[in-house]
């Protein structure tokens, strides 16, 4: 009798909790919402990523510094959004039919995102990339089902650039499309329709500035466009740039493309031209800044130590930019940035003493954080 009573009570309690779960926190303080229901395949799980408060930096600046956790996308990065949209765009325009082939020139996360999306939709994927990329990256893309062609790394203006080779490959095939991530504005549309609205909803419209770096231009331009329009221009937009990129000099010089030498430890960001994704929204940029590799690598270690966030260098460059924008705007401001991906694909470099010494970056990491340098 006693056991039966306990069972009845437990069943009744669980049913009551299930009934209220979509509306309020459970007894374990986990916010369970209808949005976290069953995704319709892999593509249904792309987007709707959390916005994480970076506690230590928020306390330091007296602002709310928030990072969009794009590493939680199924392919592990913000590029899943663009990958899905460029494929959907090709489908909608009749350029890609069942059993077709997607071709792209990419050296990083866009290829991984496309590999996941193409596998889930039944398309073949062909990737052209510079032969300077690691064997591990090539192996990963092949593991995900892609056909990979590493080609000599040459400037965009050279007809043998990996992007142009990808275009020509697609032209030779029937039922194939070159998704052209840099100049295909479906990339930008992904962020106008998903990232921007998510940020606005998650902050309840209480956002003062958005900042991130850009490679294709899609994330920065699309998110900026939405936030500017929905706020009536109130939200400020600041572009962050790694060393060697021309974008900061372009905006700070009033529109002059000035060649810059040098390189950065970051991957997938920085640019030598104004892409079509960025071109439409250059007038929306309120300011720009160059973030040094020294600041970026220090923030890799700070985010791990202080926030428990294991982030890649492009993500921590964005975090540094968000901190600088917060300091510029003053206490009480809310600044949002993108946590593009995690450090999992870069650990053999970012946490290697030998690599840090080769890049002259070991001294940029405070001594108390060097305990995380666990690789030789």
Swiss-Prot record:
Entry annotated with the keyword Ribosomal protein: no
EC identifiers of the protein: 2.5.1.-, 2.5.1.47
Chief location bin: mitochondrion
SUPFAM superfamilies: Tryptophan synthase beta subunit-like PLP-dependent enzymes (SSF53686)
GO cellular component: cytoplasm; mitochondrion
InterPro entries listed in its UniProt record: Cys_Synth/Cystath_Beta-Synth, P-phosphate_BS, TrpB-like_PALP, TrpB-like_PALP_sf
Modified-residue entries (N6-(pyridoxal phosphate)lysine), positions: 79
Function statement: Catalyzes the conversion of O-succinyl-L-serine into cysteine, the last step in the cysteine biosynthesis pathway. Can also use O-acetyl-L-serine.
Family to which the UniProt record says this protein belongs: Belongs to the cysteine synthase/cystathionine beta-synthase family.
Protein name as annotated: Cysteine synthase 1
Organism: Neurospora crassa (strain ATCC 24698 / 74-OR23-1A / CBS 708.71 / DSM 1257 / FGSC 987)
Upper classification of the organism: Eukaryota, Fungi, Dikarya, Ascomycota, Pezizomycotina
